A protein has these predicted regions:
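Outer-membrane beta-barrel channels and translocator barrels
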Residues: 4, 42-46, 86-89, 98, ...
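Transmembrane beta-strand segments that form the barrel wall of outer-membrane beta-barrel proteins
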Residues: 12-23, 52, 56-57, 113-117, ...
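Surface-exposed beta-loop-beta
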Residues: 153-245
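Detector for outer-membrane/organellar transmembrane beta-barrel domains
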Residues: 176, 213-302
Length: 359
């Protein structure tokens, strides 16, 4: 049998405008292009080799009332990885997306990406590392990873990663009656250069994660992360993040899918037992208006300060072209959900228009 090779060149072009109706009167205009090249070679019937390379090219301009306009341009790698598949094994090396867990909106185990639940495209920066996965005959799977060179905050991280320090961990996922469950572990050296008075702090950090999801006529899941730092840093020494969620599709019209999640956060000082507890909730819905259009929404509540984030999104699909009209309201401070430097959203009320072309 002759080995087969495949080449593909794809890409995504995004045009975006965002108008804030708050006191600052912020206006944003931007474009983004993510070209993607993939090469896939079949070695034999049980093994293959693949390469993916993509870049993130962005141009933007921001105007705030009473301030001069700010223009930015950026070119950075988005994904650059090599993958080797051999029977039940997968090895992937390079800049890649690593994502797992059962929660949809408020995600304690969002350890390695920056996906914002308000972003309809789910864009995120990747991490540099080696990922190894083994798939067992009973459909259970084992993940092992090692990371290096990823100093930025990710997910709900309170601290950053120490420069030039390796990270490693693993995950085992298996099936349970009516669903699946997984146990995860990750180790890194954390530093606090983003926190005043703790700029010289660094400490080994251990985190354990558990997640499960079952289908009992409706979806139900839980997700948990416990983080322990061996050196005391006040209430950030120990952190517990616990999520409960459900979803159900109602037989209304074309089918209304509703999801509800709760996130509980508890940070504790090992020496004084001082703690900080916070609560968050999120409600989302999605309703298909037809074969090519849908309406979705998100209500996000921060219980400690009684503030809300609201979003209503209309999507229209035209073959390779998609359009989004997003109405939103964000408080000045948003906690409990991931925010990144790719998806632009401002405080106060506003409207966002997205046009996406995939080739």
């Amino acid at each position: 049998m002759n080995a087969q090779s495949n080449y593909e060149f794809d890409g995504q072009v995004l045009g975006q405008t965002n108008i804030g109706f708050g006191k600052e009167g912020t206006k944003f205009l931007g474009t983004r292009y993510i070209p993607e090249f993939t090469f896939d070679k079949e070695i034999d019937s049980l093994s293959s080799f693949a390469i993916e390379t993509s870049f993130n090219l962005s141009l933007s301009k921001t105007n705030i009332l009473g301030h001069s306009s700010d223009a930015n341009s950026n070119l950075s790698p988005y994904r650059i990885w090599l993958r080797y598949l051999k029977k039940n094994w997968e090895l992937r090396l390079g800049l890649q997306k690593i994502d797992f867990g059962s929660a949809q909106l408020l995600r304690p185990i969002q350890w390695f990406n920056q996906i914002d639940p308000r972003d309809p495209l789910g864009l995120t920066n990747g991490v540099y590392g080696l990922l190894i996965r083994h798939y067992f005959k009973n459909n259970s799977n084992l993940w092992l990873w090692g990371l290096y060179g990823n100093e930025k905050q990710r997910g709900l991280d309170a601290l950053t990663t120490l420069n030039d320090s390796p990270e490693f961990g693993g995950r085992f996922q298996t099936f349970i009656p009516k669903g699946e469950a997984a146990l995860s572990y990750h180790y890194r050296e954390a530093e606090a250069n983003n926190i005043p008075f703790f700029e010289n702090y660094s400490s080994p950090e251990h985190r354990i994660g558990f997640d499960s999801k079952i289908d009992i006529g409706f979806g139900m899941w839980t997700e948990l992360t416990y983080v322990h730092r061996t050196k005391n840093i006040g209430i950030l020494t120990n952190q517990l993040l616990l999520n409960f969620g459900v979803d159900y599709t109602f037989r209304i019209g074309n089918g209304l899918t509703v999801s509800k999640e709760y996130l509980f956060s508890d940070s504790t000082d090992s020496m004084t037992n001082e703690s900080l507890r916070r609560g968050f909730s999120a409600l989302s819905f999605n309703y298909p208006l037809g074969l090519s259009s849908s309406l979705s929404g998100l209500i996000y509540q921060q219980w400690n300060n009684n503030t809300q984030t609201l979003m209503l999104n209309y999507q229209q699909q035209f073959n390779s072209l998609s359009g989004y009209i997003i109405l939103y309201y964000n408080p000045k401070t948003v906690e409990g959900i991931q925010q990144n430097d790719i998806f632009q959203s401002f405080s106060g009320p506003g409207i966002q228009l997205l046009i996406v072309f995939n080739h």
